[in-house]
């Protein structure tokens, strides 16, 4: 009986921690912070050039591991579009779902560019990804007052 009481208390404490955590972050926040943001960064960090005083540096992946990282990010973006489109998460049906499905297409294009090791196409896809992100954030980002 003592063990049962201990497990009950442990369960209550676990639930309290879970509910506190979910109150601080929305599902959309967590989806963005832990899935989409890192996936987008994998694409943006692998396309284009950085110019510094030391010179110009190409961000294109130089090995299979680098291209695989881009492919992973592309798949996460593509498949996350379905998570965003779930009825419980859709802010409004038309525009929200359209922007979510735009991510699907962009993820597929990024994956294809990585498969072909096409850094120029990946750069274009990265620009398109940025535009979709900005369009969504301008419309739906909840600003704290």
State the predicted function of each range.
Residues 143-145:
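Short Cys/His-rich "knuckle" micro-motifs
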Residues 129-140:
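The canonical Cys-X-X-Cys-His
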Residues 1-4:
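Positively charged n-region of N-terminal signal peptides that target proteins for export
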Residues 6-8:
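Sec-dependent N-terminal signal peptides
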Residues 10-18:
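Hydrophobic h-region of N-terminal signal peptides that target proteins for export
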Residues 19-127:
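Extracytoplasmic c-type cytochrome modules immediately beyond a signal peptide or single-pass transmembrane anchor
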């Amino acid at each position: 009986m003592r063990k049962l009481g201990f497990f009950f208390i442990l369960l209550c404490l676990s639930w309290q921690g879970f509910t506190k955590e979910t109150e601080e972050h929305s599902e959309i926040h967590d989806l963005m912070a832990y899935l989409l943001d890192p996936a987008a960064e994998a694409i943006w960090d692998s396309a284009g050039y950085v110019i510094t005083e030391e010179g110009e540096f190409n961000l294109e992946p130089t090995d299979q591991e680098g291209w695989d990282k881009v492919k992973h990010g592309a798949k996460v973006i593509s498949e996350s579009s379905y998570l965003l489109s779930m009825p419980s998460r859709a802010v409004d049906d038309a525009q929200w779902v359209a922007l979510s499905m735009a991510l699907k297409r962009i993820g597929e294009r990024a994956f294809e560019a990585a498969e072909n090791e096409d850094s120029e196409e990946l750069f274009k896809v990265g620009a398109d990804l940025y535009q979709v992100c900005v369009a969504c954030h301008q419309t739906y980002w909840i600003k704290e007052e």
